[in-house]
Amino acid sequence: MVEQLTQHDPRRIGPFEVLGRLGAGGMGLVYLARSASGRRVAIKTVRTELAEDQLFRVRFTREVEAARAVSGFYTAAVVDADPRAAVPWLATAYVPAPSLEEIVNECGPMPTQAVRWLAAGIAQALQSIHGAGLVHRDLKPSNVLVVEDGPRVIDFGIASGVSNTRLTMTNVAVGTPAYMSPEQARDSRSVTGASDIFSLGSTLVFAATGHAPFHGANPVETVFMLVREGPDLEGLPDDLRPLIESCMQMDATHPAAEPRDLQAQLAPHLFASGSDDSGTASAWLPVPATAMIERRRGGRRTARRPPRPRPRRLRAAPQGPGAGHRLAQRGRPAFALPAVLALAAVRRVRTAAGPSAAPDGGPVQLPGAKVPIGPGRRAGEGRGAAAAAPRRRDRLGPAARRSERFLGGHGPHRTVPASTLRPGTPSPAPDRWRPWRFRMSNDVWGTPVVSGDLLYVTSFEVHALDVGNGRRQFKTRDVAWAMAVEGGRIHASDGPSLYALDAASGAEQWRLATDAWVYALKADRGTVLTATRGGGVQGWEASNGEKLWEVTGAQSDFETAEAGPVIHDGTVYLWQDARLRALDARTGLERWSYPIGDAASCGGVPVRVTPATDGYVYVAAGTRVLAVETGSGPVRWHFEAPAVFLSPPAFAPGPAVTGGGVYLADYLGTVYALDATTGKDRWRIATEARSSIEPVLVAVGNVHVGSGSALYTLDAVTDTPKWRFAAGGDVVGAPWWRRPGPLRLGGPRALHPGRGGRPAALKLATGGEITGSPVAQAGVVYACSKDRCVYALDALKGTGTGNRART
């Protein structure tokens, strides 16, 4: 979408008049411009830090000359460039067409023949690019435009020009982790055209399935999956597997297919006798996709719909002889479940008594409940629409046992991740603060941190933004995969090193090399805690980086930030040698340990720990929940469930009669309310299969849990269902609550009390799905979004800025 120019954008670049913004790429901003003759071009500019690198300028100049020589029907031709300008730029022919990413997000996965049609065109484009001596290095769905007569590959030249500069010498692999090759992730400076062929296979997987072949919670986890595990090919049609396997060679020493070989392989399928050999999109693509192409060609855009939900799948390993014979076998996924448990989850949901489907917008009658769960109004629906909504009472069959009631749904979908209670304060005064938005050059991930007058977010580096106006005060020089802010310092790691910066100025205070890659980092009361690949856990003095202690042999089955050790109130809790151990945070000396079991005995899922304010730590270990006294380690009680827990327990203080207790949901979606004193099961309600690793949300006597595309609210004392809100799509991120405002979802929505106590929706003013968890402080909501923006929103109204954004 073409956006209006800001006061910081140039009005002319070289001989071109700048008309608007097209977006932001990995190397810099992209503008729509017009030549003196009226020809429209797309101009890619280069980020300041790259422009200051003389090695980059030399290489970029050479690559631009090579890019000018690229000719081919399936590429966007280079029109002009100035590598020596203060801000280097490259202009290519503007193609008014949607990207492959946009088409799949809005219209769904493509048919087999359409994927082959795309593959043939992209392969021919790569043949032209490689013939000019270039390697694309960033082939992905957003860099493939789809027009009526075939795909167009864009953005070659800049990505290849950045290789061998200081950007790649700070452990940043050029390219997009979800689509790059393993050899590019290891060393992007020495890749060949075979790497582009691998990326072509990854792009085709997205086109055919709707999901990337590699996906993690953040880029570093995606790279880890890429080099250690192999691609996720779930949903890929069998007819396309030979094509994908010929592209995605996990072993770089194995000869990859050449572009001309792929074209020869595809030709018999595309132009067989009796087939439509026109070669146009209408011959291969579904009607919605061709309509979208036509609208874009005519300069019209429909209101953008959110991307189709992509469930986070828990996959069993391939079975049978020859399974994935040319693709490396996947290792254990970060939170993989044993196949028998995955099968049990499917059976549990599909065989629930009676029909399980409940219409969106209609009430759901729980067996044994006196009233149905009422639907909340969706965003944008007025009272008339709400009144016209169907009022069917779809019963779910015979009454289940009193202790288990099945809520309506459509099978095992990705659920609404939840977080623990976050206190809030009144809405900001309008005369002192206005909503703002800050656009990053790269993806933003993780949960933002507010400390004093600054907001800290991670987008490769740590960026410090003024909470009042969104202006960037500074950013770190180096990459930060993990970050914690505590005691006036930013503690961060780029993987092989750990460093501390002054939180107010960004000035470096200390830096040291670690013995292994840091995958988790936390800070508490002057101690920095890190977990490294291979089972290492270290404690560091926050003021100077002195190593206080180190232990080895900690669990290494689940090396993710969520499964890492926990530090709270001077105590470190870690999983080591099949025992849960409590260590002194300053000395590393063991205070107590408990035999929790190894990964196999814990159901193949990580142990999750929640330290609470009542002097106990609540532990979820496979199918078990334990309450352990934090001082000396005796177990207060033990609870056993029929399914494993992926998320940690949530603790609510107070007696059970007021909603106090321990709440959590297992993998099958059953929500449990446990008495914090005895561990007895006060009640349980089963929803749909749940793969969220976030805890349920307990606030003001209510338990909020996501199930598929709906959010259910249950009374924490009696388990009485209060309402059901149909979100209109799977909700991502974590819901949170602030007193006295609305309940907020991880996606761009908030729920306000409506008629009869049922919720009405208010859409938060963000431009994409929320990543991490939003944070509320002083009446402001801070959230990071998949549109590469950081938002500051009014916590009471959920409103934000318009289209303008600071950069």
Swiss-Prot record:
Residues annotated as catalytic: 138 (proton acceptor)
A single GO cellular-component term on record: cytoplasm
Protein residues bound to ATP: 22-30, 44
Keyword annotations: ATP-binding, Kinase, Nucleotide-binding, Phosphoprotein, Serine/threonine-protein kinase, Transferase
Keyword ATP-binding among record annotations: yes
Key word Endoplasmic reticulum present: no
Post-translational modification (record): Autophosphorylated mainly on threonine residues. Some phosphorylation on serine residues. Autophosphorylation on Thr-168 is the major site enhancing kinase activity towards AfsR, and is regulated though interaction with KbpA.
Domain Protein kinase as annotated: residue spans: 16-272
Residue positions where Phosphothreonine is found in the record: 168
EC number(s) from the headed UniProt entry: 2.7.11.1
Stretches with biased composition (Low complexity): 353-363
Swiss-Prot/TrEMBL catalytic activity: L-seryl-[protein] + ATP = O-phospho-L-seryl-[protein] + ADP + H(+); L-threonyl-[protein] + ATP = O-phospho-L-threonyl-[protein] + ADP + H(+)
Entry-annotated residues carrying Phosphoserine: 71
Molecular function GO labels: ATP binding; protein serine kinase activity; protein serine/threonine kinase activity
Disordered as annotated region, ranges: 292-328, 353-429
Bias (Basic residues) ranges: 297-315
Pfam families associated with the record: Pkinase, PQQ_2
Quaternary structure, from the entry: Interacts (via the N-terminal kinase domain) with KbpA; the interaction prevents autophosphorylation of AfsK.
Role of this protein: Component of the AfsK/AfsR system involved in the response of aerial mycelium formation to glucose.
Family per similarity comment: Belongs to the protein kinase superfamily. Ser/Thr protein kinase family.
Protein name, per record: Serine/threonine-protein kinase AfsK
Taxonomic path: Bacteria, Bacillati, Actinomycetota, Actinomycetes, Kitasatosporales
Name of the encoding gene: afsK
